[in-house]
Design a protein with these regions (language model features):
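A glycine/serine/threonine-rich, flexible loop-to-helix segment
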Residues: 95-117, 156
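Conserved NAD(P)H cofactor-binding loop of Rossmann-fold oxidoreductase domains
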Residues: 1-8, 151-152
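Conserved loop-to-helix N-cap of the C-terminal "lid" that shapes the substrate pocket in Rossmann-like
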Residues: 89, 108-111, 120-130
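C-terminal substrate-recognition "lid" of short-chain dehydrogenase/reductases
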Residues: 122-149, 154
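Conserved Rossmann-fold SDR core element
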Residues: 72, 81-97, 142-149
Length: 156
């Protein structure tokens, strides 16, 4: 997931203020949609980003899974209200970004372990996520859906 703070770790030990702050991403998205939709042309579209844990969470991912799930359900809930304008979600899996640190060896080891069981056993790239976003931007017949860009992580 992108944007906002991210609480991680076991839910029962998680700082609830951090968990609550994780939802800043959702509130930001709802504000963008609510205030921005009226400025879109009828063939305009909005793309939000969730994350694979929204539909397949691992231990320690309660916050990111909850927020991502809320983002995806929000999109499904408002799609009919926005039509003919379109709104979709792109859901990345593990993506190789500086968020995972600057030490190349440690980063490669961590990403390798995190993606070893993917159907495509590697981390994705920011460019691959951008291609997923551009797909839903360009395809005028796609609305109210979630596109996974996760190397098959959600199915593995």
């Amino acid at each position: 997931a992108t944007g906002g703070e991210r609480a991680a770790g076991p839910f029962l030990q998680m700082d609830l203020a951090g968990y609550r702050a994780s939802f800043d991403k959702l509130w930001g998205y709802t504000n963008v949609v609510r205030l921005g939709a009226e400025h879109l042309s009828d063939d305009g579209n909005i793309v939000l980003v969730s994350g694979a844990p929204a539909r397949r969470a691992k231990p320690g991912q309660a916050a990111i899974a909850s927020v991502g799930g809320a983002v995806e359900q929000f999109v499904r809930a408002v799609t009919a209200e926005l039509a003919p304008k379109r709104i979709n979600v792109v859901s990345p899996g593990v993506i190789d970004t500086p968020m995972f640190g600057n030490d190349a060896d440690a980063r490669a080891k961590m990403l390798g372990g995190a993606t070893a069981n993917n159907l495509i056993p590697r981390a994705g790239t920011p460019e691959e996520v951008a291609e997923g976003i551009m797909f839903v931007v360009k395809n005028g017949f796609v609305t109210g859906t979630t596109i996974d860009v996760d190397g098959g992580w959600i199915l593995s």
